[in-house]
């Protein structure tokens, strides 16, 4: 059975050479649709404004190449989470669309040197720069580092 990624792999491989530019997935849209989901609105507010725009940011521009993430598709990134002996802190905004992933990952961790921090009122991008509301819990991060990174 052929991989569902095969068409993208063939379409993107080798492109970017003198024959042409690589195909892209698309970043955050330049014009936000009226019915855009809340997480896309938050990304737009960050990546498409002076708050987070950068000409080389993949989310501010035209996104990743269609083949750049293929190597991660079958990577079991949490398969050995329960074997981590060192301190782990997971920080998510209360309103982050990705919060479920951090909470799921936290449940796999063992030991008493793990901490899950849910920042009240914060969304995903608020934790990039504070979101104008001091959302980054620097005091908690510092305390965790001092306790666990000796």
Cite the ranges covered by each PLM segment:
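Catalytic histidine neighborhood in serine/cysteine hydrolases
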Residues: 109-125
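Alpha/beta-hydrolase-fold enzymes
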Residues: 1-49
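Catalytic active-site module of serine/aspartate enzymes centered on a nucleophile-bearing elbow/loop
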Residues: 120-150
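Active-site nucleophile elbow and catalytic-triad environment of alpha/beta-hydrolase enzymes
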Residues: 62-80, 86
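Short, conserved loop/helix-junction motifs that constitute active-site signature segments
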Residues: 81-85, 108-112
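Conserved alpha/beta-hydrolase "acid-adjacent" motif
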Residues: 73-76, 92-103, 109
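Flexible internal linker/loop segments at domain or repeat junctions
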Residues: 48-67
